Amino acid sequence: MTKAKYKILVCPSDRTGVSKFRSVDPHIRLQEMFPEDFWIDIDYAPKCEDENFFKQYDLVQFHRSIGPDFAKSQKAIEICKKLGIPTVCDIDDYWMPTVDHPAHAIVKENKLDHMITESLKIAGHITTTTKVFAQEIKKLNPNVFVLPNTVNPRERQFQPKKIDSKVMRIGWLGGSSHLKDLEIL
């Protein structure tokens, strides 16, 4: 096998939810579709302080931070900048959750909102879910691109189950952090 043209490091924030749909699945699909052009490494605990580790990559994509430690993540972003490696921070939820959000207390106690804000400021580029959210993020960093949320309709869990009925059914997909959103419906 010849060397792929672009080697991308993907650093998901978790092993479910947002990481599956916005980090892991899209990059695996990219490599499947264009194996001669892209090689994807998925790393949940990258060596954030190792300059040589990052030298092997052409781009680093992460969700909120490169690994779980925000301070090390900021150092990693600076290493990438020094090496000329583009960084792309993906964010799908507002970093300052309202008091009715299940994680509000944890976010505030651990100052995660501040740490996410700092990641957004220093990242080379940012991807997010909507134009409205992009406008908010542009207050911190002008290099924002919208990649709407999506799922793979071929996955078994998203296959429709035909039911012979005259009743219209509407599906909704979201995590517990979006329960308040259901009140709008």
Question: Where do the model's predicted regions map?
Answer:
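N-terminal pre-catalytic "stem/leader" segment of glycosyltransferase-like enzymes
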Residues: 1-67
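An aromatic- and histidine-rich active-site surface loop
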Residues: 64-82, 173, 182
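Short catalytic/ligand-binding loop motif for oxyanion handling, primarily in non-cytosolic enzymes
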Residues: 17-19, 51, 68-70, 95-99, ...
